[in-house]
Amino acid sequence: MQLGTLLAATTFSGAAALAPLLQQDVFVAGQGGYHIYRIPALIVTSNLTLLAFCEGRKHSRSDTGDIDLLLKRSTDCGKIWSEPQVVWDDGPNTCGNPCPVVDETTGTVWLLLTHNPGDTGEAQIKAGKTGATRTVWLSHSEVNGKTWAPPVDITATTKDPAWGWYATGPGVGIQIQHGPHRGRLVVPCDYSFQSADRAGSAPAVEGGSHIIYSDDHGQTWKLGGTVSPQMNECQVVELSDGAGALLLNMRNTTKANCRAQSLSHDGGQTWTVPDFPPELVEPRCQASILRYDWPNGKEPARLLFSNPASPRRWDLTVRLSRDDGKTWPVSKTLHEGPAAYSCLAVLPDKTIACLYECGRTNAYEKITFARFPIAWLEESE
């Protein structure tokens, strides 16, 4: 086992904390044969193992090129991490956008991924200037991430043929806990499409968010509803109404300068017109949203959210909502300075974990794991 760079059992910058907080660098640029590590995803398995996924980019920071899908495991809530494990390496091609989801009935970890030729970039695929496209893949582990099945192509049932670019997550999927779709596995994704001609001009490239889902414990996957245009990377969370309502939280290219949110009351088949909560400021970046707990008759249920709360990719911030995402009255800075993508998890002892991109001079120097009690967050009220 490998002990990562332990920054501290210490306090985070900002305010005095109630308890020691752990920060640990899990992936560091330039180490392990990779130029840089990006796109973190973090999930807890049925036997309480932590899985930290990311992309290992061999030669540059580019989203295109030789990119492998990597994993580290921890069995002690993030104190010690395994050596990196290569989940998928397809030579010079791009294997990425990890989005794991745990089936709580079977214990299987399903890992949704995307693939494209390493010499073909996002702009080319969006513009339709290449015969290549972005495809959707699925792997799984029945042993809590120790080994993985070879990825299989599920593009035919999860992507509209008219779409160009496609991304699973990044982040995590969920399993619906209540209502008529209880047990459904839901994975948030995004896609690009070419809009119709406008006044004789060439078609414009637009973006949308959507979900894919499985009702048979991951054996088959189907395409769910979409939200478009001007939507992008997204994450999904179940609301506390007891009927399985879903909230889709989306990066977007509007001028709102904040996140977009849309609701579904039919398991992700259809979505409402999005609204734009002004509290969730963002620089057009990925974000994470997660349920911390369910209503217990005494206290309201809580949601967690993390992203760079800035007009630029800066100041990774964690927020808390007690009204299913309508308002976010509690917030605290987890990392001051450059920061980008992140992924939240709730650990077995109910402490909160966050795996996030950060650095001193740019946001992509390392992927860091942080762990803290919810009291650390709520003391900022």
What are these model-predicted stretches?
Residues 7-18:
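Hydrophobic h-region of N-terminal signal peptides that target proteins for export
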